[in-house]
Amino acid sequence: MEENKVERPTMKMLPGDEVRQIMWRFAERYDIQMAIAGARQTARSVVARLVANGQRFTHEWTPEKQSLFDAFDASGMTAATLNADCGGLFEGPRNLAMSLVTYETAWVDNGAATSSFVNDLAMGPIAEMGTPEQKTKYMTLCAPGNPSGKTWRGSFALTEPLPYVGVDTGVLCGRVSVAEWKDGEEPMLRVEKRGRFITNIEICDYITIALDSGDERFKGSCMVVVEATDPGKFDRGAQTKKLVHQLSNTGDPVIDVVVPASRIIGGYTVKDGVIVPNLSHSEIIAQVFSKTRVGVGVMGAASLMSAIEPVIRYQRTRFRGALGVNEGSPRHALGLQMKEDVTQRLADVWATAEAASSLGFDISRVYDRIEAIQDEAKEKLGKGRAMLKAMKAPMEKAVQLLAEGKNPEEDEDVTVRYVYLMAIANVLCPSCKLWNTGHGADVMRQAISLMGGYGITEDCPGFLFYKWTDMQLDATYEGPEAVQRRQISETMGNPVFLAQVEAWAKECEACPAADRNGMNALAAALRLWAWTRDFAATAKDAAGKKLGASQRHGVVFPMADALAGLMAAKSFHADVKHLALTGGDHPVVGPELESYLNTFNDLLGTIAGNVAGEAARICAEVVFGFNAADAEKQAEFCALRAKVDVSLAGTKIAKDNAAKCLTTVMIPEALDYPM
């Protein structure tokens, strides 16, 4: 590849709403745009003032913090979590909408975003799996301005105190038993639960609780809705002394109440004198967490993206006002940006932020498409073992279509579309949570370091230090990194997904800018990863232990880490490609499309080079580190690895270009929210 000798136009200002609406696919969704406007106004006024006025200095839940919920109600953020027929904002699936609203709030503070987000989490079991009566009752009560005169708030309690908090969602110490069961009447249930680190418990009016049977008259596990006024003990517990997320309330409740059996989420039947829930707690959790984890990943992406402008401003103004630094001089105009180290490192932060955002909104759109067809597909596929058997044929067809270069999502058979989308979602969702919050927190530390000593002060512009510390909790919220790695390691071997990996590799190679935006490197890395996964699935180490065994975390977990980064770069490429195909017709974006694409492709090359190199390192450790590969396999691997190395050509030029753009891109004179 030849170095660029002709100056290319680059991004003149940081991307605005017009660009983001195209890239993230909501240019035609006026309802989402209005919801974003409400969330942005709330975040950059009410939320920002709370942070600036020191409300993060205490873990106690104050009246000032409580005002957040009034602001959420007034802006439409509360209604965004509800069905339209119950006072909600959106008709149909709303995963993308909720992710975008969460993104806007987390742009300022992740704790405030969590306070808004937790209502969606609490309502999740009811919205996804509840009976029609349960959905109508609780969604109506949670709608601002409902007939009761009070907007209900929710909470969610899954696991128990140590040692299993947030890790093993199958371990439940909460118990449900029959308190009273009169002939011809509805059974009354005793619910006993001790929760740990339960968000929003201080103010919730209801809580969705996961329980296991403590009575021979009750079979299996379930989830139950408990209201704060139910007879018995509803002790909200002491406030958790958190060092992060201080704009959300957290406690360790002790609950021992009696509720009617109609509160069992999803309903129940009675068989031979035994209450049998229609849904186990794990069935509900699998459905809910598969989507709500994305919101946490999006929070990490927003934190990263919000750091770009404050760091640029700090770098450029660092020496202004100093003796001898005259207006018009390079030092006055560029400050620290006269040296490339700071812009090179910031380019890494920016590229990571773009990829993390793209990954979060990519999986959000996938879930919207799944919701549109899942009822029809599940009806055809059946349940349990019958469903597993019925999925075989559509999975085989999806693999065949991908091999032929066709899109299974366009197939007329709804079951083919469903198994295809689920194969992708089951990897992208935990990848978003893992990469955006885990790797994202590491990259956020780089952003903090670029602010010098200012970065660890209370008045750091953009509240960057708070965001960095908040991201430590984000990485464990709704399951720590081990949980995400575990899910990826279990789902990345799906033959439909593996066929899609090859299809993505071909798509990357077909990119017109593949020789300069890292797509050749990404394609080579995807193939290297797939080969290594197949190798590990059958290879054994010197002790005769299989490398790819599900409990061999020293192998499958690093492979999950590698895949998550590759998925982020893949999603970013899809967004840049969509902008290239559709942005030209936009009256604002069109005239500047070339400059936007040049810079986005430079950022894409930056992140593609990073994740491809990391994936190659991990794969090499798997193949060579356990002495499991014979000479033939080593040669195969080395040939694929060499393709990755050669394909990195141009990725550092892309990073140079992205770094240079950071010295010229225009930013506002000051942040649009208080410090």
Question: Where do the model's predicted regions map?
Answer:
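A short core secondary-structure module
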Residues: E186-R236
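N-terminal glycine-rich flavin-associated loop
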Residues: A113-K135, M139, Y164, A179
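C-terminal helix-coil-helix/basic helical segment that borders enzyme active sites and/or dimer interfaces
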Residues: V51-H59, E354-K433, A568-G609, G613-A631
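Glycine-rich phosphate/cofactor-binding loops in nucleotide/flavin-utilizing enzymes
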Residues: E2-E18, V101, V414-V419, V443, ...
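Flexible, small-/acidic-enriched active-site or ligand-binding loops
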Residues: G232-G266
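A glycine-rich, basic-preceded beta-loop-alpha segment at the flavin cofactor/substrate interface
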Residues: G16, P253-T292, I312-Q337, F497-A513, ...
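C-terminal amphipathic alpha-helical interaction region
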Residues: A513-M675
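Amphipathic, small/basic residue-rich leader segments at the start of a protein or domain
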Residues: M1-F117, K137-P147, D368-E412, V416, ...
